[in-house]
Amino acid sequence: VITRTGDPMNPNDLGRVNLSNAKSIIVLDSDDSGDATVVSIVLAVKAVNTNPNLKIIAELDDANTAEALSTATNGQVIAVRSHDVIARVTAQASRQPGLAAVTLDLLDFDGDEIYFQDVPALTGKTYRDALLAFNDASVIGLVHANGNTELNPKHTTKIGAGARVIAVAEDDDKVVYTGVSDVVANKKIPTPKAFTRKAEHLLVIGWSSMGRSVLTE
C-alpha cells in the first residue's frame, strides 16, 4: 500500500499519483463534508485524467446528486449510495435469516466470490447454454458489450460478441468453459405451490438517517 498526502481537489496534487494508469478510482464520502466534496474531487479527477476508460466509483448520499453525476459524466462515474445499500441489506437480512451470511461470503475472500469472465465460446449462444457450460462455477448473469448488466436474464437471451458472464466460483481460475451440455435432468419438475403472503411483525429499535430506507425496503 502506497500513500500520498495532499488535497484531492487540487489537480497538482492529483498529478503526483499517476491516476490515469489506475484500474479504477474510489472516492469516499467524508463524514463531515458530504456530497459536495465528493463532486468536487470527481471534477478534479476528470480534469487530470487522460484515460477515457477509467471508471470512477463515488460514494454519495443524495439520490439526485448520484443520478446527475452519472449522467453528466456519460456513465464514467458509478455512484454508490452506501447508506441506502446498508439499509436495504439490513431490512432484507431481518426478513430472511441467513442472507447476511451469504452476502458476507460473496464479498470476502474466504468462500466463493463473484467474477466477471470473457467467454468467446459462448458468443451467439443463449443464457440457458451458459448456465450449463461451467462445471465449477454458477452463472448468475451477463454484462453485455454496451456495459449493461443483467442478473438472471431470460433463458432465451442471446449472448453477443464482447459480452461477459457473471459467475459465482471459488476463484477466478474456476470459471472455466467446459462446453454446453445437452443433458437435461430426467426428473419431473414439481408443480409450484400456491404462495400466500402473510403479515410480518418486525420491531425497529432506535432511529437514524437510514430508518426511512429500512422501512421502505
PLM feature spans:
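Cytosolic regulatory regions of ion transport systems
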Residues: 1-217
